[in-house]
Design a protein with these regions (language model features):
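Nucleotide donor/acceptor-binding cores
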Residues: 2-3, 137
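Conserved N-terminal/central alpha/beta ligand/cofactor-binding core
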Residues: 3, 8-115, 157, 166-167
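Voltage-sensor-like transmembrane helices and their cytoplasmic interface
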Residues: 8, 39, 138, 144-147
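Glycine-rich loop(s) and the adjacent beta-strand/alpha-helix scaffold that form part
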Residues: 141-169
Length: 169
C-alpha cells in the first residue's frame, strides 16, 4: 500500500548492471534471493527465447565466448542467468518497476546547495536543481555519489575503514 517515487538524475535505471556490467561473477548461486533472484530469472527467461539471438548458435556461441569466465553464465535448474546485455537488464528493470507501480522521474538532479530540508534528524523534503520539490516519509539514496546522504548530514566513510573498527583481520 505504499507509493514509491524513483528519481533518476539521468535517463536510465539499473545502475552499473544496465550501464555495461553485463555479467555477474558470483559462484554462490544459492545465496541469491529476492529481487536479485527475480532479475536473474527474468534474464534467463529472456535468453531462453530463440528469437532474441542474432547468432544461430545462440547460447552455445555466447557460452564459448564468455561463459568460461563466469561459471558458465547460467544455471538451468535454478532458471537463472548471469550474463546479459545492458539493454536487456534495463528493460527488465523498467518492467519490474512498472509492474510494482513505481513512478519514475528522469533527468532530475538534487540541488547541492539547498536540496535537503530536515526537521530534527528526519528529511522532510528535497529540492531539485530545477526547483521542483518532493516530499516523502522515507528517502533512500541509491546513487553512486551519495549526495542526498551527505547533504542530510549522515555520517559515512570514504574508502575502506580500518580492520580494527569491526574486528576484521
Amino acid at each position: 500500500g505504499k507509493r514509491v517515487l524513483l528519481i533518476s538524475q539521468d535517463g536510465h535505471v539499473g545502475g552499473l548492471t544496465a550501464s555495461g556490467l553485463g555479467a555477474t561473477d558470483i559462484n554462490q548461486r544459492e545465496a541469491i534471493g529476492g529481487l536479485s533472484r527475480e532479475f536473474y530469472q527474468r534474464v534467463y527467461d529472456y535468453y531462453s527465447r530463440s528469437e532474441v539471438w542474432t547468432n544461430p548458435e545462440g547460447w552455445e556461441y555466447y557460452s564459448r565466448q564468455l561463459g568460461k569466465y563466469f561459471w558458465r553464465g547460467k544455471n538451468d535448474s535454478l532458471r537463472m542467468q548471469w550474463m546479459f546485455e545492458p539493454h536487456v537488464a534495463e528493460k527488465i528493470f523498467q518492467d519490474m518497476l512498472l509492474e510494482a507501480g513505481v513512478e519514475v522521474v528522469f533527468g532530475e538532479r538534487l540541488d547541492l546547495q539547498v536540496g535537503v530540508e530536515k526537521k530534527g534528524n528526519r528529511i522532510v523534503r528535497i529540492r531539485m536543481e530545477n526547483g521542483r520539490v518532493y516530499e516523502g516519509h522515507m528517502y533512500i539514496d541509491a546513487t553512486y555519489e551519495g549526495d542526498l546522504m551527505a547533504l542530510a548530514g549522515v555520517s559515512y566513510t570514504v574508502g575502506r575503514e580500518a580492520n580494527a573498527l569491526y574486528g576484521e583481520t
